[in-house]
Each structure stands twice: as C-alpha cells, then as structure tokens.
C-alpha cells in the first residue's frame, strides 16, 4: 500500500500545507519510509510558521542529531532557545551537543542553565547526573580505555579536581532522587576504578541492581566492586550472570571476566576471555600487556 499512502500523504500536504496534523502525518510517513532528508526539509520549511511550533524545532534537532550534523544542531538549538527560552529540553539538547563535540565546560554550563527550568526533582536528578558524567569525561579526556587508562588519567593534574566535581554532582543528583539507578551505577563504578570508598560503592551498586531488571552493565559494576574488595568468588558469579545477559557481548565485560579469572588462577580461561574482548574491539595493547603479565 506504500504508493497509495505516499500519494495520499503528499496530496494532503499540498492541499493543507499549514495544517499541523497534515504536516506531522506527512513527516512521519517520510520517516517511516526512510526518507529522513525529505522529512527534515519539510520540518525546516515550517520553522518560520506563525506562531512558531516547538515540535517542529524538536524534530529538526532530533533528525540533525541522528544524522550527526553537530553544527546544524547547534544552529537550530540556538534558534529554538531564542523563541522558547523556558523549554528545558532545548537547553539539554544544547548540553548534549556540546558534550558530543567534547566541549565539556560549555556542556556543563548548558546543563546547569537547564536546571533553572526543571520542574521536578526527578528531572533535576537526571540533569545533575549529566553534569557528573560530563565532569568525568573531562577528567579522562584523551584516554582511550576507561579501565586501563584510569591510572594514567589520575596522573593528570586536573584529574582529581574534575573527579571531585563529578562526585559532587552525583551527590546533588542522589539528593533529588536517591533511586537514580544510572547515577548509583556510575558513581559506584568510578569509585571502584579509583579503588576508593569501596564499601560505599558496593552499597550504591547493590541498590542499582535492586532497582533494575537484570541490567548487564550494572551487574558488571557490581562484580567489579566485589573484585576490588577481594571477593573474587562472588565477583565471578555475578560477572557470569552479566555476560549471560549481555546480548551486545561488550568487550569490557569480557575483559573484566578475564581479569577475575586471572586473579583466581584460571589463566587459560582468562586468556580466552581476553581474546574474546580483543575480537570485540578492546584495546590491543592492553590485551597484550595482560598476556605478558599473566
């Protein structure tokens, strides 16, 4: 029925060009048909409608983001904020785009500006989580692998200060929503990588997995905290569960399991999982180093 639907949608668009229902119908038809560029052009055609329509700007920003056009995203976010300065999602989109472009201080500023328009504690918690994540990205900028390059990142002069701000932001987030599972997980994981406050990390990780249904990433964090606490047998059991649930076959999870097996003296199986991690894209130098040290 595609030809008939296409004819109907295009006919309606020509006959009722200013009807929002028709514009949305035609745009959604184009998107469903894989014609993203045409849908984008249609939305852009209506950005000057009076009164301006927020949803058209959101759609343009979403499609430009999907197409990975950061310059265009910035331009349309700027236009949207001029027209709708109180819309928190446009401020968040600005923060996400700046983060994607690795402009971390500017992203943090945009996220903080969005806090002024947040109306619920749940949203404030999410935003503070974004701020914490961005401070962490700034702290480890330039390091290819978060686990193995963490020690090298620590030696950077700004690392401690940036991570202090990261944890401070997470604390703000959890004051607004103590059950923000993503923040609990990230907070616990980064503490485990630094090897500090491990009992606190374990409490947060335990809460994160209690709040979610078999999330392999959160189980990985829990296993890693247990591993850092020296509870390797428990860590192995939890990591086995994480790997069984991980349909993406994350390289980090495979390598983590290899590290746990290595610590338990199961070198042969450890190397198997390290190699699996390598096949999934884990840094080759880090795998080589593990093999040589094994």
Language-model segment annotations:
Residues 1-268, 274-294:
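Alpha-solenoid helical repeat scaffolds
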């Amino acid at each position: 029925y595609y030809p008939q639907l296409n004819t109907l949608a295009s006919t309606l668009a020509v006959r009722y060009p200013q009807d929002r229902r028709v514009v949305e119908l035609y745009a959604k038809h184009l998107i469903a048909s894989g014609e993203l560029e045409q849908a984008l052009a249609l939305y852009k055609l209506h950005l000057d409608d009076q009164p301006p329509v927020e949803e058209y700007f959101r759609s343009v920003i979403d499609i430009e983001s999907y197409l990975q056009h950061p310059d265009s995203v910035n331009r349309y976010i700027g236009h949207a904020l001029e027209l709708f300065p109180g819309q928190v999602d446009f401020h968040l989109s600005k923060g996400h785009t700046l983060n994607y472009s690795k402009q971390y201080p500017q992203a943090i500023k945009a996220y903080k500006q969005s806090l002024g328009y947040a109306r619920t504690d749940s949203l404030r918690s999410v935003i503070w989580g974004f701020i914490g994540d961005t401070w962490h990205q700034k702290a480890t900028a330039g390091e290819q692998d978060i686990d193995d390059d963490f020690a090298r990142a620590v030696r950077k002069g700004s690392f401690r200060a940036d991570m202090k701000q990261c944890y401070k932001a997470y604390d703000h987030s959890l004051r607004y929503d103590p059950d923000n599972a993503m923040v609990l997980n990230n907070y616990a994981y980064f503490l485990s990588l630094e090897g500090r406050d491990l009992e606190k990390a374990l409490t947060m990780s335990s809460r994160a997995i209690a709040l979610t249904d078999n999330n392999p990433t959160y189980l990985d964090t829990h296993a890693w905290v247990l591993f850092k606490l020296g509870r390797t047998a428990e860590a192995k059991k939890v990591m086995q569960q994480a790997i069984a649930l991980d349909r993406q076959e994350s390289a980090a999870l495979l390598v983590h399991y290899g590290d746990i097996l290595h610590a338990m003296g199961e070198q042969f199986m450890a190397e198997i999982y390290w190699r699996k991690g390598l096949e999934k894209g884990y840094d080759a130098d880090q795998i080589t180093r593990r093999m040589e040290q094994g």
